[in-house]
Amino acid sequence: MSKAKLLVLGLLTSGCALGWVPAAVPATPAVVCTLAPGQTSLAAGTRHGLAAHLQQYPDLSLATTAQKQAARRLLERARTASERWRNVAAAKASGFNTQLARRAPGDDSIGYLHAEHRRFSADHHILDVKRPESLIYATQPGHRPVLIGVMFSVPRGVRGPTPAGPIDRWHSHLVCMRGHKRGLAPVDGRCRVGSRLTQGSEMLHLWFTRDLRSAFAVHAPVAELCRDGLLTPRACRAGSTGHEM
């Protein structure tokens, strides 16, 4: 096995992530471990990390009153600004890529469509509720896509801002990159020849649930989405199974 493949496998299994100097875009990201041996997740209050390492929900007790207010303002502003794209056809007309991935025969699981706007993704507007990098729709067979949230992202190598303190938690993924092209998820834990393992750009999910804690969850908060009527009863009975589309 090549050294490159060994590096990929080692990073994926050892709890290591790649990090940068905040607000800088380095030529070559440094490799740093973010999990201690035996540790399964990062400490509550950690604001940046791999999606698999961050805790699902923020610990609101760690936030100040001002930070909670900032989180509520961001949530309500995003919810209001995104109302125009509740209909997926309107989102498509505005430039979001709403094309669904093909489902395998018999696949009736929840899909989470991240409808990206390529121009918004490249405009360097950060945490702009009027220009979210992606809209998130729940997709379920036999039903129209339902807008359940937005996703903000920052340019590669830039740390996402945290005006809401520990409530704002920016996640990232390990990807294989070739030159300046977009990174792709490693296939079977390996990067193809000519590409290198690095950490993708940071992202922040914001879910349109009715409570602050679940609204800032790293992954789709299925229980709360069900509670608030954003997923169908059938999908809720099926549990947390779902995938991005």
Feature names for model-found ranges:
Residues 19, 24-27:
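Boundary at the C-terminal end of the N-terminal hydrophobic targeting segment
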Residues 28-245:
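Primary mode marks residue(s) on the alpha4-beta5-alpha5 output face of response regulator receiver
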Residues 8-17:
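Bacterial N-terminal signal peptides
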Residues 13, 23-24, 133:
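A generic alpha-helix preference that emphasizes hydrophobic side chains
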Residues 1-8:
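Bacterial N-terminal signal peptides that target proteins for export
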